[in-house]
Amino acid sequence: MSESQNSLGGGALWNDLQHLIMDAQVALADLPRWEKPFHIFWLLGPFFLLIERSPADLWLSILALAFAVRSLCHRDGAWLSHGWVRAAFIFWFVCLLSASFSITPAYALGEAMSWFRFPLFAMAAAFWLGRDKRLLYAMLLSSGFGMMLMTGILTAEMLIEGQKGGRLTWPYGDLVPGNYLAKAGLPAFCVMVALAVSARGKTIFLMGTLASFSLALSVLTGERINLIIRLCAGFMAGISWRFTWRKFVLVCVISIVVVLSVFALQGSVEGRFTTAILHDLPTGASSDYYRVMGGGVMAFFDAPLLGIGTANYRELCANILAEGSAFRCDNHPHNFYIQMLAETGILGFAAGLFMISAMIMSLFRAGRANKQNVVAATAYIVPLGLFFPLQSTADFFGQWNNIFLWSAVALSMAAVNLRAEQGSS
């Protein structure tokens, strides 16, 4: 296999793309007949995520269930020996335990049971669907195409309808398109930025242009945390693979210019990303995030060991907060770790932290062992960015956010299969 086939960014861009597609076709042809449709279905995932939550959830759930059935039929339990897999099962067990002892056990157990489809999907990607690096690269390419298709959709919305209250809503009809770019598209975005910093030839210009264009659309969506995730992830990707100061500084300057240019051309969004961020910092009662997160802390104090029950916060918050409290209820506390404390207690918090840390460390070690491969070197950034504690977040046990988030985490976890090869890049 040629050098350009071994990884991304090692040669002429068009030749690399041709090799990736041909390698994927060969890999699919080598699969057992019954497995081939599932792998093709997996590769189409980024486009299901562009439709709506129900088709996307069906895609993810079918593949997670198929992996579980396949493992039972083949009596394949080798994947259970991996540290991050065991950590996920430990966290799930604590969630089930918390739900069982809550005052609404039927509801909480149902939520805890259904949530596990997300880490199970990550296991399916790592130990089945993305085990062949040729299909892993194909999925990364599919994710990149999906990300650029989303930027095209959002560009069309800007030209046809414009922003609505400083936000964009296409193609879903609600305020979440930035989730696709920042979460589902994060593995591809990290590779794009790394290639823009350290690849050769025309690849640098094309990857830099595509990354900058999608970054501009992130600003226009008006989703602040998602923009920060992409900026920070891009910064880390730039220093994680074949780092060179001169190109890295150039990419950083271009990113800053892109963001400032959007502010200048679309002045209505500037305040949302500057003064509004400072006002919303959860440092006092004047911040709504402080009052919402504080409600989660109060729920933790109400049941510190096992919490109030998985996904129970929205149901029980009003009974926990006293009338006239400085805090207020919402569907969730808007921070993953506060939500873990509130709903699964200190045991769930410790188990959840262990699970997330195990995933990040598995990918970081794999990247260090294969530093010349851009996908392996940047994969750890995805769970680190998406689970970073100092940010406001969506519902940890919810549906739509988890579909975006775990589709990216699943793709990144498959990078543990990449092994360093002599002469690869």
Predicted regions and their residues:
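Long extracytoplasmic/lumenal interhelical loops at the membrane interface
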Residues: 280-294, 302, 306-344
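A membrane-periplasm/extracellular boundary helix in multi-pass inner-membrane enzymes
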Residues: 221, 238-285, 294-302, 310
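Alpha-helical transmembrane segments of multi-pass inner-membrane proteins
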Residues: 46, 120, 134-166, 173-242, ...
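Transmembrane alpha-helices of multi-pass inner-membrane enzymes
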Residues: 62-68, 190-191, 234-235, 379-391, ...
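Membrane-interface catalytic loops of GT-C/OST-like multi-pass glycosylation enzymes that act
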Residues: 106-110, 178, 221-229, 330-335, ...
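Transmembrane signal-anchor hairpin modules in multi-pass inner-membrane enzymes, especially those
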Residues: 1-110, 127, 131-137, 141, ...
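Hydrophobic transmembrane alpha-helices and their immediate junctions
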Residues: 344-386
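Membrane-embedded alpha-helical segments of multi-pass membrane proteins
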Residues: 54-71, 112-124, 180-189, 227-235, ...
